[in-house]
């Protein structure tokens, strides 16, 4: 799992229940980020390590996350991502490196009244159950770094499943960041 840490923490808003959920296609990059998302954030990752996160706009409805451990501020990693809004939830999406299938990952997020950015991973077991019960189409995969599942359903079916309040337990809090300075 350690090899995924950089990718997953950087997108820690993207995944870290310890396993990877990927999708064949990304949500369309048609939504601008909600007010307050861009800027500098700090938090503690799943391993108790202090982290910093900077979110910036890099193009039309395209963004970049730059992450680093506070103990190693010179070791920064940048990851492009997009934002979309479906139902009552905001989503982040990013391309997964080729060694993990090269598809896309999706995570939920919210901005709280307490100036926090809360990121939700998709629970691997819940997604596997959805596939077994035919609510979603997909297949399990494994890499040297751990288990994963690739969801093959089209995005309409994916978001119908994710937006259904009955499936809210598919989202697991991955990380909670606090705003470092004023929102953009």
In which residue ranges do the predicted regions lie?
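C-terminal motif of bacterial Sec signal peptides marking the signal peptidase cleavage site
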Residues: 15-18
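Calycin-type beta-barrel ligand-binding domains and close structural analogs
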Residues: 20-36, 44-51, 56-58, 62-184
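Bacterial N-terminal signal peptides that target proteins for export
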Residues: 1-8
């Amino acid at each position: 799992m350690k090899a995924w840490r950089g990718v997953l923490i950087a997108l820690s808003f993207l995944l870290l229940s310890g396993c990877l959920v990927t999708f064949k296609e990304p949500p369309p990059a048609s939504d601008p980020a909600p007010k307050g998302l861009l800027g500098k954030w700090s938090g503690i990752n799943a391993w108790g390590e202090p982290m910093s996160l900077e979110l910036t706009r890099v193009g039309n409805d395209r963004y970049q996350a730059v992450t680093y451990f506070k103990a190693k501020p010179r070791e920064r990693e940048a990851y492009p991502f997009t934002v979309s809004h479906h139902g009552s939830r905001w989503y982040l999406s990013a391309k997964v490196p080729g060694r993990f299938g090269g598809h896309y990952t999706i995570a939920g997020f919210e901005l709280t009244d307490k100036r926090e950015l809360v990121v939700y991973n998709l629970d691997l077991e819940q997604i596997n159950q959805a596939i077994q019960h035919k609510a979603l189409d997909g297949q399990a995969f494994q890499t040297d770094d751990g288990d994963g599942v690739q969801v093959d359903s089209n995005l309409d079916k994916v978001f119908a499943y994710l937006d259904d309040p009955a499936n809210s337990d598919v989202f697991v809090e991955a990380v909670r960041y606090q705003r470092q300075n004023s929102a953009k």
